[in-house]
């Protein structure tokens, strides 16, 4: 049976859960939120160190890219959350806002209301930073928001050794989430008492007690219903039936950097020639839908270690420690430390993040490891390469074509930056605090020393996504942008996009924090 609501929100992830929650604070306003996946009842969701067990499960969209020529022709696995909380229910819980300059760059492209000075108040509104490390985070952080953020409870000693090795190599310590967090630090995490705390936990579940909010799970949006030049609802499929939920005011797409552009194109909003290839009538010619795809590529170097890695996280003692005290290895977010560095000294800002995981997180975590190990490597946080999302067919259940075009920039800047980052990692591996803890090279395979050939091999065979796609429904002040600075889709009234797809340029950080920010900002823009 079809239904009506003031607002229809598609997706309940990092941004969608926020939008649905905030819009429903007005008891006179009705909101329906559509989630393709189930409730977040999978037992591994709450256990921080277990997130890779959610890969290719029933709560994962389980995407693959097209073969990447610069990465040995491999198809790269892209997990995306298909569950209440979206990817915030299966990510590594790293709360890394990025640099103030990233948001000022957004403002240059989309107006002053997206500057760091403007969005800082939203971060404070979001965050509930535990008192135990508030002195570390400083006045920039929030302490009364709904999203719990804390220090790690039981980081591994080898993580401390990696940080010490970075310092010995001349890199400074940094305060996490400061306006310019250049340097190295232990990761702060979206956890509460040692368990994952997703946007479903922070925003959606408290709001679901409201009578004016309906959250429909197992409801896959198939297109936006458009009457003339106005969005009037969303068609979705549930239990094998096709239904429509009508929106009296607005439809808000929060389906993420893959699914939001796919939905726009399925609804007739996109490049007219591409839509015609799939016999989709053009509602509005928007050539940039699906373009400007940005992602953070990571290359991991793997090493055998004797002990103290998360390979032992499922041992009985660790299970008991977690169940009784919420301590031990199972509280680990895996990516326990990171640092921002420059591939070239003349750069104004870091273009690389180095990440450390005290775990044998090899082969995109799709193959069970054989023993103890650790990984670390560079992440390209300011890529020059741009990719694209396109339709594979007009079937809404067909996975879209994901073409990130990693390392494809004509000047070779991205490749040079990653190689520079790998050389820094090799230096850190050989520094005194760490070198005696590392055994044989586990990745890339069949390597015995960290020479240039090994680093080149790692770039080709050990690179994968850090799970941060963005930019495919670019926000901007220019007429070519997909959405305007108020997140309204150009050419169609009553339709907005609010998720990582609207980011007009990269963030030198992780996309969860700015996606939550976009959700908060979107709710204010809609209500104003």
Swiss-Prot record:
Top-level taxonomic group: Bacteria
Any single Gene Ontology cellular-component annotation: plasma membrane
Record keywords, A-Z: FAD, Flavoprotein, Oxidoreductase
Coiled coil: none
Cross-referenced InterPro entries: FAD/NAD-bd_sf, GMC_OxRdtase, GMC_OxRdtase_N, GMC_OxRtase_C
GO molecular function, one term: flavin adenine dinucleotide binding
Active site positions: 468 (proton acceptor)
Keyword Ribosomal protein: no
Cofactor(s) annotated in UniProt: FAD
Family to which the UniProt record says this protein belongs: Belongs to the GMC oxidoreductase family.
This protein's name: Uncharacterized GMC-type oxidoreductase Rv1279
């Amino acid at each position: 049976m079809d239904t009506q609501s003031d607002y229809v929100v598609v997706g309940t992830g990092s941004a969608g859960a926020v939008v649905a929650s905030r819009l429903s604070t007005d008891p006179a306003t009705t909101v329906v939120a559509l989630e393709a996946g189930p409730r977040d009842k999978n037992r591994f969701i709450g256990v921080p160190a277990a997130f890779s067990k959610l890969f290719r499960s029933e709560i994962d969209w389980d995407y693959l890219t097209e073969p990447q020529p610069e990465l040995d022709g491999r198809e790269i696995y892209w997990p995306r959350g298909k569950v209440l909380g979206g990817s915030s229910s299966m990510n590594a819980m790293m709360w890394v806002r990025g640099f103030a300059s990233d948001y000022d760059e957004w403002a240059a492209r989309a107006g002053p209301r997206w500057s760091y000075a403007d969005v800082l108040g939203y971060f404070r509104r979001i965050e509930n930073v535990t008192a135990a490390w508030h002195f570390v985070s400083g006045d920039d952080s929030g302490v009364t928001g709904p999203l719990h953020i804390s220090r790690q409870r039981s980081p591994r000693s080898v993580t401390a050794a990696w940080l010490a090795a970075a310092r010995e190599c001349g890199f400074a310590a940094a305060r996490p989430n400061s306006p310019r967090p250049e340097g190295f630090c232990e990761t702060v995490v979206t956890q509460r008492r040692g368990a994952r705390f997703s946007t479903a936990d922070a925003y959606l579940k408290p709001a679901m007690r409201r009578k004016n909010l309906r959250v429909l799970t197992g409801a896959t949006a198939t297109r936006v219903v458009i009457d003339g030049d106005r969005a009037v609802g969303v068609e979705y499929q549930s239990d094998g039936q096709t239904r429509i939920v009508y929106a009296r005011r607005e439809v808000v797409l929060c389906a993420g950097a893959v699914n939001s552009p796919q939905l726009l194109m399925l609804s007739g909003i996109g490049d007219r020639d591409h839509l015609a290839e799939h016999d989709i009538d053009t509602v509005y010619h928007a050539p940039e839908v699906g373009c400007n795809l940005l992602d953070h590529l990571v290359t991991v170097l793997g090493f055998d270690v004797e002990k103290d890695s998360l390979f032992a996280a499922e041992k009985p003692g660790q299970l008991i420690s977690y169940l009784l005290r919420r301590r031990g290895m199972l509280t680990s977010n895996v990516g326990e430390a990171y640092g921002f560095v420059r591939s070239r000294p003349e750069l104004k800002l870091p273009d690389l993040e180095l990440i450390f995981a005290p775990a044998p997180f090899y082969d995109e975590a799709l193959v069970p490891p054989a023993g103890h190990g650790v990984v670390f490597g560079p992440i390209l946080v300011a890529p020059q390469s741009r990719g694209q999302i396109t339709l594979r067919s007009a079937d809404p259940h067909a996975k879209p074509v994901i073409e990130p075009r990693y390392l494809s920039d004509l000047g070779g800047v991205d490749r040079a930056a990653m190689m520079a980052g790998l050389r820094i990692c090799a230096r850190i591996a050989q520094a005194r605090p760490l070198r005696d803890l590392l055994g044989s090279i586990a990745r890339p395979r069949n390597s015995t020393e960290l020479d240039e050939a090994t680093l080149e091999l790692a770039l080709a065979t050990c690179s994968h996504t850090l799970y941060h796609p963005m930019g495919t429904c670019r926000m901007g002040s220019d007429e070519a942008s997909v959405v305007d600075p108020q997140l309204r889709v150009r050419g169609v009234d009553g339709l907005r996009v609010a998720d990582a797809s609207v980011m007009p340029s990269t963030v030198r950080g992780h996309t969860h924090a700015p996606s939550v920010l976009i959700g908060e900002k979107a709710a204010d823009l809609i209500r104003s």
